[in-house]
């Protein structure tokens, strides 16, 4: 706790946020409770072709049946404005709902199924829907170090709100690698990397990288800093290939 008090003023200087929420980063590694919920409040900044300053709220609820079943539901909403020199600020919105179930098959192997619906004004996605399934396996599980790998397939529907409205339907392979490290009683670090290529178009792929540092205040609250990066090799219309987001906010556990 002394370490946290020393570093707290530095953390509060970085009140900037990373709006792309990634469901794997919000997964609770402590599965003792059968029912648990958490809420995140973040303030942030993201940069691609434009700069956006925003505020983000995320709610998550998990249900655990130890050594058998894990399900969770996430709701996320983000409101911000796009700032350009000598131009009127533009209001931007982003949000999604995500549901996932993981069924344990063996001690270190589970089967997952998931679905999601959302929208993203920042990259002109009017509506995005997807569903899929896959496997999740533990690579290493120790008290202060945990690593997981997941892989599967998903069907993705995207409707774009560009000058000319268009729709894209793709089947994608999705995989991710998760690393979670406890660096002390009040400090932890996690990294999640996704790779999502289209099955029919090998050059249409996305790479998502999420990094988070979490400072524990007490059993019911944390301060989080995240630095995330997204690369889309074949973005639609005039969207940039890459953008990054920086996030600093508070997490309440109940």
Predicted regions and their residues:
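Cleavable N-terminal export/targeting peptides
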Residues: 1-33
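Short glycine/proline- and aromatic-enriched beta-strand/turn motifs that initiate or cap beta-hairpins
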Residues: 20-72
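Transmembrane beta-barrel strands of outer-membrane/channel proteins
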Residues: 39-45, 73-79, 113-117, 133, ...
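Residue-level signature of outer-membrane beta-barrel architecture
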Residues: 45, 61-63, 103, 117, ...
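Solvent-exposed loop/turn segments connecting transmembrane beta-strands
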Residues: 45-54, 85-91, 119-127, 143, ...
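Repeated loop/turn-to-beta-strand initiation elements of outer-membrane beta-barrel proteins
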Residues: 67-73, 108-111, 143-147, 183-189, ...
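Outer-membrane pore/translocation modules
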Residues: 73-172
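Outer-membrane beta-barrel "beta-signal"
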Residues: 242-254
